[in-house]
Amino acid sequence: MNRLYPHPIIAREGWPIIGGGLALSLLVSMCCGWWSLPFWVFTVFALQFFRDPAREIPQNPEAVLSPVDGRIVVVERARDPYRDVDALKISIFMNVFNVHSQKSPADCTVTKVVYNKGKFVNADLDKASTENERNAVLATTASGREITFVQVAGLVARRILCYTQAGAKLSRGERYGFIRFGSRVDVYLPVDAQAQVAIGDKVTGVKTVLARLPLTDSQADPVSQAASVETAANPSAEQQQIEAAAAKIQAAVQDVLKD
């Protein structure tokens, strides 16, 4: 759970549909008995589609998490169309049996949200990234890296829901959106990001690590930095012995040259 979404297990976007299906199923059951079976099947399908279970979230600062459940359909170097820079592109396709809530792949601050109208071709196709209805979130991670994650509507999905805006701070795994009934999410990362998945891999939202973003020296673990400084300031006994031996050799060479 998080501060913006305190209702796990069943996504709130599905409450009206599930409630309506349950009421209709009960009504038809009382009137028509077994003829209500299709309505019960629909209600059960809606329950599984709108499930939104709580999950453990990896806290490795280098890890970029999968924002959704699904299957990897793209891992390639591409152009981020929202920043006009080269990037590592990773795309996840969601079928109707996957969890469809979207969650932040990293601790980040949203800098811009861009919505584009478009078509509704099969989200499994490459052209869906540029032709379909889509909503892009441009953000800067806690370590200062720029990332973009894009909700893409699919053949059946006709409504993208995004609950974040420019200036908002998202925690890794924090819920920020939802797409109904099959869709896709594109993630654009800096080119030095190291992909941890391959095409065809099945991923689990916020549990699977899509890629790792290397940290610069200035962003390294302060404990490690302190240890390095201490080592430099206090050389080991072995280092001291080596330096003493080098000084003796240098002195001996100078004596020979004087003679």
UniProtKB/Swiss-Prot annotation:
Modified residues (Pyruvic acid (Ser)): S183
Superkingdom, natural source: Bacteria
Post-translational modification: Is synthesized initially as an inactive proenzyme. Formation of the active enzyme involves a self-maturation process in which the active site pyruvoyl group is generated from an internal serine residue via an autocatalytic post-translational modification. Two non-identical subunits are generated from the proenzyme in this reaction, and the pyruvate is formed at the N-terminus of the alpha chain, which is derived from the carboxyl end of the proenzyme.
Any one Gene Ontology molecular-function term assigned to this protein's record: phosphatidylserine decarboxylase activity
Biological process (GO), any one: phosphatidylethanolamine biosynthetic process
UniProt catalytic activity: a 1,2-diacyl-sn-glycero-3-phospho-L-serine + H(+) = a 1,2-diacyl-sn-glycero-3-phosphoethanolamine + CO2
UniProt membrane topology term: Peripheral membrane protein
Pathway(s) it belongs to: Phospholipid metabolism; phosphatidylethanolamine biosynthesis; phosphatidylethanolamine from CDP-diacylglycerol: step 2/2
Cofactor note: Binds 1 pyruvoyl group covalently per subunit.
Predominant subcellular localization, coarse grouping: membrane
Keyword field contains Transmembrane: no
Cofactor(s) needed: pyruvate
GO cellular component, one term: plasma membrane
Subunit text: Heterodimer of a large membrane-associated beta subunit and a small pyruvoyl-containing alpha subunit.
PANTHER family given in the database record: ARCHAETIDYLSERINE DECARBOXYLASE PROENZYME-RELATED (PTHR35809:SF1)
Protein family per UniProt: Belongs to the phosphatidylserine decarboxylase family. PSD-A subfamily.
Task performed by this protein: Catalyzes the formation of phosphatidylethanolamine (PtdEtn) from phosphatidylserine (PtdSer).
NCBIfam families xrefs: AS_decarb, PRK05305.1-2, PRK05305.1-5
Protein name: Phosphatidylserine decarboxylase proenzyme
Organism whose genome encodes this protein: Neisseria gonorrhoeae (strain NCCP11945)
Organism classification: Bacteria, Pseudomonadati, Pseudomonadota, Betaproteobacteria, Neisseriales
